[in-house]
Amino acid sequence: MGRYSGKTCRLLFMLVLTAAFFVAELVSGYLGNSIALLSDSFNMLSDLISLCVGLGSGYIARRGPRGSSATYGYVRAEVVGALSNAVFLTALCFTIFVEAVLRLARPERIDDPELVLIVGALGLAVNVVGLLIFQDCGACFSRCTRGRRTRPSQQPSQGDPRGALGCPQEAATATAPGSGTAVTLRGSSAGRKQQEGATVFSNVAGDSLNTENEPEETTKKEKKSEALNIRGVLLHVMGDALGSVVVVITAIIFYVQPLRREDPCNWQCYIDPSLTVVMVIIILSSAFPLIKETAVILLQMVPKGVNMEELMSQLSTVPGISSVHEVHIWELISGKIIATLHIKHQKGTEYQDASRKIREIFHHAGIHNVTIQFETLDLKEALEQKDFLLTCSAPCITQSCAKKLCCPPGTLPLALVNGCAEHNGRSSRESYRSIEAPEVAIDVDGCPREQGQTLSKTQERQHYENSTHF
């Protein structure tokens, strides 16, 4: 289709058709004195705006990253567009609801039901065409997404598997999803201790596990990626179709049983605003889930279907791991989940095997973009050593910037927050003191005392880090 894809041509076709019927319904609504037709015309206006947002956000999302300002590209543009469409439709529904309530208080008749019926029927036909078009777009998108997932991905070349953040003579290469740009991290000081550094394993370009049944596992485990942008546009078209149904029903009633000018308003005058209120409720019941889903993505919350407690329990069974901290799981877009975590790894054990087992755990949970930072822990050192505190070995350089960290010191361990019982021979309630680390007083009154998770009431000050130790 030339410079435009089939999806873009359909959006442009609906844009022109919707603009024409918006003008027609607006004029007919004022001439026929129909609140349903007027509300339906403004639904058409919302469709125009949603189509423009859908076209713009889709174009931006397809653009590749230009320069280093957008390391993830612009794939979230469609998420922002879907949220904008849903919020705008919600605000429009509130306005229509207020107008319908006022019309219930002061009912009015439809002056020209024949004109309203004709325009409403044509608007319903346009909306049915739009529903068929965008349902087809959603089906095509789902097929294309499944096709991309089943293609074998090219594995990046691997050199030295160990990377470093502040670790001498080590490097790690990471590829940002959606960008294809490799970033190499190199250490700068040769005099630092090995345990003060951190080894980074980045798998953000894709899962490098050579699993033979990956397509089947992906179909079963992975969350189906949905076109949020198309859902936002489809939601507007569905709401407009419901409005057209209300217009047609009201016009048919007044056309079959017309009211004379001298007759007072009866039950027929309440049909129009009553059905409008029902239409608003139906639209809002579909708009709120879309707002919630897009807001969860933009707030980088843990995606639905990911059980943090189960993941932590499985991570605790990996040999050689002493603690897990700085665990973050979020969605870049719908269906593409990213996880980052810090691992306290016991010195002398094989961390490559631990890395593979950790990535297998996330792989079976449907998380394939995993970044692991390993931190060495020497169990032979004294208990008062800093590295045995099970805190992060690569914090901020100075204590003044500790509050700017995503998990600042003094927060409760993940095991205390989610009540997850850990294994590997250590209690999740164990803690270690340090002169260098700040202390935080924790009130233990009212804490649950089951599964062995009890604290002494005489313990007044205790330092906890946002880590889970095993």
Swiss-Prot record:
Keywords: Cell membrane, Endosome, Golgi apparatus, Ion transport, Manganese, Membrane, Transmembrane, Transmembrane helix, Transport, Zinc, Zinc transport
Membrane-topology annotation of the record: Multi-pass membrane protein
SUPFAM superfamilies for the chain: Cation efflux protein transmembrane domain-like
Disrupted-gene phenotype: Homozygous knockout mice lacking Slc30a10 are born at expected Mendelian ratios and do not display overt phenotype until postnatal day 16 to 18. After weaning they fail to gain weight, are smaller, and die prematurely. Manganese levels are elevated in the tested tissues including brain, liver, blood and thyroid and manganese toxicity induces an hypothyroidism phenotype.
Ranges of biased composition (kind: Basic and acidic residues): 458-470
Reaction catalysis annotation: Mn(2+)(out) + Ca(2+)(in) = Mn(2+)(in) + Ca(2+)(out); Zn(2+)(in) = Zn(2+)(out)
Tissue expression remark: Specifically expressed in fetal liver and fetal brain.
GO BP field: cellular response to angiotensin; epidermal growth factor receptor signaling pathway; intracellular manganese ion homeostasis; intracellular zinc ion homeostasis; manganese ion export across plasma membrane; manganese ion homeostasis; positive regulation of ERK1 and ERK2 cascade; zinc ion import into organelle
Extracellular topological segments: 32-34, 103-113, 255-270
Listed Low complexity bias regions: 171-184
Annotated spans, Disordered: 146-223, 451-470
Subcellular location: Cell membrane; Golgi apparatus membrane; Recycling endosome membrane; Early endosome membrane
Alphabetized InterPro entries for the sequence: Cation_efflux, Cation_efflux_TMD_sf
Site keyed Important for coupling of manganese to calcium transport: positions: 43
Subunit structure, as described in the record: Forms homodimers. Forms heterodimers and high-molecular weight oligomers with SLC30A3, SLC30A2 and SLC30A4; heterodimerization is mediated by covalent-bound tyrosine residues, occurs probably in a tissue-specific manner and could mediate the intracellular zinc transport activity into early endosomes and recycling endosomes.
Function noted in UniProt: Calcium:manganese antiporter of the plasma membrane mediating the efflux of intracellular manganese coupled to an active extracellular calcium exchange. Required for intracellular manganese homeostasis, an essential cation for the function of several enzymes, including some crucially important for the metabolism of neurotransmitters and other neuronal metabolic pathways. Manganese can also be cytotoxic and induce oxidative stress, mitochondrial dysfunction and apoptosis.
Protein family according to the UniProt entry: Belongs to the cation diffusion facilitator (CDF) transporter (TC 2.A.4) family. SLC30A subfamily.
Protein name: Calcium/manganese antiporter SLC30A10
Organism: Mus musculus
Designated gene of the protein: Slc30a10
